[in-house]
Amino acid sequence: MTWTFLSHHAHVLILLAKNPEETIDQLAFACGITSRSIVSILNDLEAEGYIARQRVGRNNRYSINQDGPLRHPTSFHHTVGDLIEALGSFGDA
């Protein structure tokens, strides 16, 4: 497979919508990328206000800003919530 329809950032958001307590290693395995790449993506998403990170013991819990606009010029009128709703409802496994 040489390309996909969704970016790794989108995959991470969808996975976090399904399980906000997913670990970096679990996200990396599910996305097929390195843990270091996941950390970079999480930092990007947090810096832009798409997710918030809360420390719970030794782990993090992530909440998603569903109202955050998509970034591409052709889809900026849609939100992160729209994307997640279209591809997998919040909390669905």
Where are the model-predicted features located?
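Amphipathic alpha-helical dimerization/coiled-coil segments
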Residues: 69-93
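Alpha-helical residues within the helix-turn-helix
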Residues: 26-29, 46-47
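A short, conserved structural fragment
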Residues: 46-56
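Alpha-helical DNA-recognition elements
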Residues: 40, 44
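Key DNA-contact positions within bacterial/archaeal DNA-binding proteins
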Residues: 36
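Pre-recognition alpha-helix immediately N-terminal to the DNA-recognition helix
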Residues: 10-14
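Short amphipathic alpha-helical elements of helix-turn-helix/winged-helix folds
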Residues: 15-19
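Short, cationic-aromatic polyanion-contact patches
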Residues: 2-9, 23, 55-76
